[in-house]
């Protein structure tokens, strides 16, 4: 049989007189043991000494003194019985040893792997022990295997000079009971004692210090890890006298523990374990000596799973109290004499991280067990992780315990003998000690605050003050009803004694079932989060746990209330006053009171817990031997019925606990109009605070829910319930980049993600905005934040920085629409209210430039505001086109005085001379105060819809009279300017115009004069009578109409111009949206449409020139254009009655100056309608020819006859018609294009002057060559520089692609080398580069270098993606996905996860699923320069060409097909405009141009060789 020693920490104490005799006898025993002989007397002395070392009575330390002083007399007859009588008590340790205090339950790291040998059956058996206490005895008897041995401790020996001590303070190792049936000592016992006697001599030297607050730890090995720091020797020496006196008093009380049945059961089981391990355990080895595998496995942090004797600790007997505190000793803890079966269960959840719960069946207890269920799974789950149920009723705080324990009074106490540092604090639980005494003392810490729940007797001045002992104190909570009758101190000082007498109450199951998990979280949070020394340690409790506890403790009342500090209160708090120390000496450091709770329930809601605060004279500062002069925080002075908050749990420093109470009380004082704090010097003393903390206090007082952090709110919403960490093996760490936004898992902002795509090889979802350039405005939360934040608005919409803001003077000049009927001004001089220039025009001429614009022209809306055609209140801002749909109203600067004439098309801007312009009145019919609900609804619509439904301007003929204009232009009441749908358009009867002087009434937005003529003396007015309201317009206030002529919309104009033609079919749906889309037409009809004098469609012109070769020849088109030019005499006379109309060309310059306006007014009465119309048609023809020559000169490079015909036409009829300037412009363009083509053929092409020519090139990265003459390889070049040079090569080839190579499938015909040489070159290189990638990988026979090559290509592809070179990304991925490379499983397995994640991401990005949907979405958000993957466009062109008919059913040309082809070609041309600004590196560029590779069959053979 083996008697196991206990590891102890040696405390050098001055109390050495009581053990002199024992040390002498031990020396005598040493000599006897060396000779392997022993007498009965010496044996008794050995056992007595060992008994003294293991004997620890938590309630009475003086019992140890008596045992040590009388050990020679008591134990002479029955040594074994004396051992059995004492062995169940808690072992003593000596405090103050060197840091050799690593728990013996934790072996060396090398041997950790040997401890995880538990089986599934053992786990389940242990859980049955947890869940069914009545069956624990049977399970304990069945589980007596060799793995549950309690090893002996390696006891550090103290130096010879250290004085012996009388008794050990506490024990952190469990000791086993030896049954009384054992009647003698065997030789092995003597051998064991002889081997360990040297250590036992030091162990018997125990200290006499009073550590009554030290709790007896529960025997779970994990509790041994929750250690408090070791007490200093000086503090122990200063406490010896006081503690010894208290020990004597406790000894007189005669409180003795009684042994229960459960105690006997465990004692017999422990003895059987000792007997069984006697044969296994050899000589007195160390606990940590576990090198031999045949030796039993000693308890480690995880081996308690198989230790069935210490699965559950027993509840205390009735009449005893439990001290739950921080047992910070470093060895295994054991239960005191009152150990049984039904004690508070352990929370093993935190150990799941260490890999203990490897069994699947056991894991179901955490995942499938019902928390509140009555079944076995629910009970086991509650025993393991605890339930979060709390009942708060009428001032009594009741915690529900999951274990069915009897009526006990739990006292949360602190363990003495702890400093600010803990060596192995790996457990969340505090140790629970059983004590039959109800009196104990707690020594609070400097750093870790205690919960302010206390008893009046705590602050009574003790007769014997104690010296300060730095030890973090846990919460002091009585398990029954707690009534706070004393005000809490400003903060608990070092020597504050708390004597809490538990209140007896009848048996109540609800009170018995205390919420153990809540208590665990409270203690762990107090010891970990609030301890400054534990700040660097990762705590097992999270902020969510602490906030959850706070929310469960208090009600949800007063959600919106917040604390506001008044000036008087701030002044009072800043006033210093005398010190205060309740029954103790003051603390050495004053905690600022500004650190207040941020939790709104702690700071605002009044709980139901009755806490009466009485400011009695007992709280005055008492004398202390070691009192200092430091001041304590501000006092609390309230009425006796003030409610105080329960323990706050979410603070981050010790002062927050008491400061929250102060804040609550001071708020009540403020509510009672007590603006000044009553400084009661008899009770408390104020502490002056630094003014630095005042601003911090105001910040802390703010409700976190008033201005929440969006990220915090999202995390809180996701983690409504705190979940346990998943099981993992101890050696596997969590990847560091899993929770960080990476290429594989980018940060997502989509509320509804797009469709997930995957390639054939890797199936990984990629969101649309996994790239950095995407505007992340899909989340409504982000939209709202941007809308309410000025800086963010400027960040997302840079156009707002240069915008004109709406000033107050502008708003004052705006007449609301709903008041247009009622406002009548007698000011004849200011009829125009809305103008560009804010302020009133006091001259009789209203010549300020109006902001009325063309209907719906998006391009022109950037230059002028739209206020005349909308029923929203006119204002100074205008709508600017923004790429983001979220910027519905983006103010842009109002332009300088500009003409409302229609902006000319981009291809006729420099051809048409400025024609004269006529004047017409365009009135916005104001909507008076009517009962039309639809009108009111439309007036509230956003103006963004009107922009989206806008239409390019339409040039129409001008009516000759004002009467015709007014009668044919219906006022619009819709937000869409040109909408003519019945619900949104009202056509009033034609108004009657009366000439004469009448009282002016500004009932609408009278447009100002755009003319240069200022009729200052004009008193004659045009009064236009409209049934809705009266509008007074000066005769000079005439603006040139920018709407379709005669007020007709686009559908009407198209119907009039092509009413007799059957060779053209329009799409009526697009006409209703003011867009022209032709379904099918003949060549003649298309030429007539493109050159029509009333319609301007530049997009149709470009589409026609791109695709006309698919249905006709260039010579035929030129012939049709010349015929149209000469067809001016046969224009339809549809407007014969409008002889005074002026045909305004839409192909003139965008703005018209005052001189042009004068010319237009001087020619307004001309009768040359036909001549002007013919001139407009001729300009239209010349515009098409100019665009053809400039943008599509490749049609003339191989067709010299066509070019000669155009030159003859320009030098002949065009000059004869007086258009010499237009002819010279086109001829210059022809000469320039011819010179450029000749330069390209000769190879002397000049460098293209692009917008990047002025940019600085980024510095190139030269290759790393060891020798100048070394042949460079792929590994010598930098990944980024390879991507740059590859991008330069490919973009140069891409920019040479011509539009004619994309039509008629020229790239797939037999003569493709001639018709599409540039596309063929790109296709060849795209097929060569993947073979080169595969060849570089397969040719390397060494596995490591082969993996490095794969990593390099993945990195190059990633760099190409960052450079927007998607063509190179696709090429490299194609090479990596080839079968010869992809089959190399051993090579791919050696790649780091970082590269594999990047490879999967790139594959998902370029996946062909859903017709490259993800790639297309990403591409459309990239800015130039960009290099797209050309294969996607070629695929689209192939499908369009082969899947659609060239002609429609009526035999006409299928224009829809041509339009779609033109859109694809225009997108290809879009990315050719801007080139990359990288400096070419010749050595890398030449290397990339000379690449080559094996064919796929040879690659596969080589792949089989390197990896069969």
UniProtKB/Swiss-Prot annotation:
Which Gene Ontology terms of cellular component type are present?
plasma membrane
- The segment annotated Disordered runs over 1-73, 128-182, 197-272, 396-517, 565-593, 606-727, 831-1021, 1153-1172
What ranges does the record list as Polar residues composition bias? 128-150, 172-182, 492-510
Composition bias of kind Basic and acidic residues appears in: 223-232, 399-409
Q: Coiled-coil intervals in this record?
A: 659-686
Protein's UniProt keywords contain Coiled coil: yes
Q: Which domain of life is it from?
A: Eukaryota
Bridged cysteine pairs (disulfide): none
Q: Does the keyword Coiled coil apply?
A: yes
Among InterPro entries, the record links this protein to: Ras-like_GEF, Ras-like_Gua-exchang_fac_N, Ras_GEF_dom_sf, RASGEF_cat_dom, RASGEF_cat_dom_sf
- Pfam families per UniProt: RasGEF, RasGEF_N
Tell me the CDD domains matching this sequence: RasGEF, REM
Q: PROSITE patterns annotated for this entry?
A: RASGEF_CAT (PS50009), RASGEF_NTER (PS50212)
Q: Which PANTHER family match?
A: GUANINE NUCLEOTIDE EXCHANGE FACTOR, RAS GUANINE NUCLEOTIDE EXCHANGE FACTOR Y
Would you tell me the protein name for this molecule? Ras guanine nucleotide exchange factor Y
- Organism, by scientific name, is Dictyostelium discoideum
